[in-house]
Amino acid sequence: MDISDHHMTDVGIIRPDVHIEVHVKSQSTAKRSDVRTHVLSLLDRHSTVLRSFKWMDFDNEFLTKNVESVTIADVTGPKLVDLKVHNLCIHIFTLNDDSPSTLNLEEEEELSAANLWLLPAVEFHGVWESLIYEEGIKTQLLDYVSTTIFFSDKNVDSNLIAWNRVVLLHGPPGTGKTSLCKGLAQKLSIRLSDRYAHSQFVEINSHSLFSKWFSESGKLVTKMFQKIQELIDDKDALVFVLIDEVESLTAARSAAQAGTEPSDAIRVVNSVLTQLDQIKRHPNVVILTTSNVTEKIDLAFVDRADIKQYIGPPSAKAIFNIYLSSLEELMKRQIIYPRQQLVSLEELETMNFMESDVTRLSLCLMNISQRSVGLSGRALRKIPFLAHALYGKTSTMTLKGFLTAMEHAVNKQRQEQASLVNCV
């Protein structure tokens, strides 16, 4: 059976989807239909592949000239994927390398209310893949937003089945909530590129709404959302709106009610909630919000969110995978040399964590990961850099030497963390 015949095998049997992301070079002038044909031919020759496999070198002149990479994306489950039993969803995209523009509210004051990116953006490329959480978190978020758009397309009556197109990610600082929002928007702009001609990402600077223009903040909120509404009015555009640290908006209302903040704060928050209610009615908008302090969020806001996902500090397993991806990158760049194979946690488990020449370095990494529990995702990503900067005796290091340096860096990070806690 030709792999390009990829819808149904028998009547009534629906195959599971597998997503193929095709990153086309920015200078390419090739038609999408031609790119698709050549990619299907490539997949037909490699019908069984590793999940998350990425082709970057091709034996096909057309693909070499026009395509940066072809990736089997976001597959969970078995390591090997049989493409012949899947429905192939091919997503062809080019990255936008424009810098973000700003949404200014007051020309004379140059008050920047938000930053605006065209997606998929070079700046967000690889963010989704770099974020490692407990299994299921990223998939659930992706499925949720995809379903909201699917229900909207099918004109499902929202009075009978309610959904708000609002996502709230909450948890301690440094766990990657803002990056996850950016990665999610980037991923969906690629997934839905056949449905929407283009996607935009608006990041609202909530702190600017509580600036020296405080007395006018209610009006400024309205003005900002009017500008966002103009983006949403283009029905060929998918618009993501990010409100970071939403507690700074919603906490203001309870503080004002308690008499500790001016009543203008209530007007600002009420204005934000009213404007969100207006824009979320549109099928082509998704509202993403983050909070570092869950208990300070206004209940009226929490009730508006369909998904309230806690993003906590990484577990030892997630930390192992974070470090593993960092070490792979350093071996690729020959900062760690020679390249040595590290065994995954799953493979260590099947070997009952027995020490041998094959597992020794991986077990060392596992111990470092366990020692790192409690550090934020932001801190964890800095450990390899600190290891080299502070404890690297030479510019190029062996894997064993680098793991020793990482151990020192983790110990230093934990000592600094303890010192800060004691100072408070």
Swiss-Prot record:
UniProt keywords (A-Z) are: ATP-binding, Differentiation, Meiosis, Nucleotide-binding, Oogenesis, Spermatogenesis
Q: Which InterPro entries match?
A: AAA+_ATPase, ATPase_AAA_core, ATPase_AAA_CS, P-loop_NTPase, Pch2-like
Q: What would be an example GO MF term here?
A: ATP hydrolysis activity
Record's superkingdom?
Eukaryota
Q: Please give the SUPFAM superfamilies that the UniProt record associates with this protein.
A: P-loop containing nucleoside triphosphate hydrolases
**Entry keyword annotation includes Transmembrane:** no
Q: Which GO terms describe its cellular component?
A: chromosome; nucleus
Which BP terms from GO are recorded?
Answer: anatomical structure morphogenesis; double-strand break repair; meiotic recombination checkpoint signaling; oogenesis; reciprocal meiotic recombination; spermatogenesis; synaptonemal complex assembly
Whether ATP-binding counts among this entry's keywords is yes
List the Pfam families.
AAA, AAA_lid_TRIP13_C, TRIP13_N
Q: Which residues bind ATP?
A: G171, P172, P173, G174, T175, G176, K177, T178
Protein family per UniProt: Belongs to the AAA ATPase family. PCH2 subfamily.
| Its job | Plays a key role in chromosome recombination and chromosome structure development during meiosis. Required at early steps in meiotic recombination that leads to non-crossovers pathways. Also needed for efficient completion of homologous synapsis by influencing crossover distribution along the chromosomes affecting both crossovers and non-crossovers pathways.
Q: Which PANTHER family match?
A: PACHYTENE CHECKPOINT PROTEIN 2, PACHYTENE CHECKPOINT PROTEIN 2 HOMOLOG
Write down what this protein is called.
Answer: Pachytene checkpoint protein 2 homolog
Q: Which organism is it from?
A: Danio rerio
Q: Which gene encodes it?
A: trip13
